[in-house]
Amino acid sequence: MYTTLIFNSTLMTMFTILTAPILTTLNPIKPNKKWTELWVKTAVQLAFFTSLIPLFIYLDQGIETITTNWQWMNTNTFNINISFKFDQYSIVFIPIALYVTWSILEFANWYMHQDPKMNQFFKYLLLFLITMMILVTANNMFQLFIGWEGVGIMSFLLIGWWHGRANANTAALQAVIYNRVGDIGLTLSMVWFAINLNTWEMQQMFIMSYNTDMTIPLLGLTLAAAGKSAQFGLHPWLPAAMEGPTPVSALLHSSTMVVAGIFLLIRLHPLMDNNKLILTTCLCLGALTTLFTAACALTQNDIKKIIAFSTSSQLGLMMVAIGLNQPQLAFLHICTHAFFKAMLFLCSGSIIHSLNDEQDIRKMGGLHNMLPTTSSCTMVSSMALTGMPFLAGFFSKDAIIESLNSSHLNAWALTTTLMATSFTAVYSLRIIYLVMMNYPRFQSLSPIDENYTKTRNPIKRLAWGSVIAGMMIFLNILPTKSQTMTMPTHMKTAAIMVTILGVLTAMELTKLTSTQLKITPNVNMHNSSNMLGYFPNIIHRLLPQTNLYLGQKMATHLTDQTWFEKIGPKGILALQIPTTKMINNSQQGLIKTYLTLFFLTTVLFTTMTMI
């Protein structure tokens, strides 16, 4: 009993610690710049160490609880409670999110030190984290929706932080609009649950849906996850989101916004267990996403955009795990992915800052001599991303591909996922080769220095996580689904073989700059990849242009010509003109015409009287 009390109280204390810096901003006295260091970073750091207590209790005793704090709303047939669900998923995810955010906040202290609104920036980052915590620990759909909308609005504010830049404003609007599409799916699903199941409590939903056809609400949930986690069709906002400051990109892509959609499906996965249509949809959608975005990453030259596309590719892999009916593997990949993706963004931010805001990898090179720590950590995170054995990404990526390999599902999903895994190795090695190796390809700069503890310490902490976190999580989390225990050697080594194939391909491509096989290379495939499959041009340019053209035609032709000219006053005028012309022609003073008309009228009248 006392263990359960300690378990619940420490988790609620963690929320209190995180909200304390927000409450201090209610003071009308403006805080100084040390507020970010004294309050925000310290609060997240303290909350992380506090969250380790329930984590160790869970690992030791397996305790999972649901804490109901108060009743939000009560009607005759419908209750909404504010309750927190502390189970395997939330207890493991919370320390990881806090650890990653702690590193990002410390890095942001150095990265944003010249920003005049630095305190507000840190407050937004903290609110971003809190809303994600609310989403992760929610025990009902109403509370989950609060966290869902919270991460959405905070992402809009943070992506468009530098609102003086047109690209940042456009990226923020894209994020909101695409997420609105997903929000429609979640809202309609919640309405369906309220009408048909009469509850938003997750445990009651799982029980009452046992003999119910859940296809319609699950399609809404899939749409919601596709919007929030940037699946194919709703993906363009995620690469554009890198227009925000680098700490925002690191937090957004690692442990908050983009994994919210996948986490929604993990949390509500008991509803999907026996629905083959939804599972197949998730599998094919994830496979298509991971291949398409990995192919787009191959030809990008902006270092942050390459990393952003890699995030979208990994989200597709998580969706594949959902479609395989293995939600614990998707969750494992969320946890391991957070470490090396945050480190990749922090390393890229350090490099960009050192090179006077240069983001083109073609203008870098030779940084392993000038930034040895950053270069080493970039290499570690890139290898973890490719699934190098015994790094963090290996334990989750390899498990997903093994599960896909041994399942009796379509070969198309397996083929596309393996191709995407190979592409991951190609663009990761491309970053390493063009940024770290060879000679510098940039102009002479002031001496480059990375001897700042606020730069090195966060990156080193995340590097440790990228090395050992995968094994620690893999060994301590019990699977919720039965896993394949034996398989042939060729299936077991398929993932690492396609990764090696990708590395060899990338090494071969680096030599083709001097020994090209074709004088005029095929630019169609390159342009298709570089321009994201022409998707933004079609969706963001062609469709609005067509709508504007049709609107203009309707306004000028349909409204003006039809209503004003054909039906309105000009229409009446047009009807009267022929009659007027006929009368006018008969009244022109022509004697012969008058006599002829008189004669014809007289003859006609006489004939009629005689009859």
Swiss-Prot record:
It is a multi-pass membrane protein. InterPro entries: NADH_DH_su5_C (IPR010934), NADHpl_OxRdtase_5_subgr (IPR018393), ND/Mrp_TM (IPR001750), NU5C-like (IPR003945), Proton_antipo_N (IPR001516). It catalyses: a ubiquinone + NADH + 5 H(+)(in) = a ubiquinol + NAD(+) + 4 H(+)(out). The gene is MT-ND5. It is an enzyme of class 7 (translocase). The keyword Ribonucleoprotein does not apply. NCBIfam families: NDH_I_L. Core subunit of the mitochondrial membrane respiratory chain NADH dehydrogenase (Complex I) that is believed to belong to the minimal assembly required for catalysis. Complex I functions in the transfer of electrons from NADH to the respiratory chain. The immediate electron acceptor for the enzyme is believed to be ubiquinone. It comes from the Eukaryota. Signal peptide: none annotated. Its EC number is 7.1.1.2. It comes from Latimeria chalumnae (Coelacanth). GO terms for biological process: ATP synthesis coupled electron transport; electron transport coupled proton transport. It is found in: Mitochondrion inner membrane. Belongs to the complex I subunit 5 family. PANTHER family: NADH-UBIQUINONE OXIDOREDUCTASE CHAIN 5. Pfam families: NADH5_C, Proton_antipo_M, Proton_antipo_N. Keywords: Electron transport, Membrane, Mitochondrion, Mitochondrion inner membrane, NAD, Respiratory chain, Translocase, Transmembrane, Transmembrane helix, Transport, Ubiquinone. This is NADH-ubiquinone oxidoreductase chain 5.
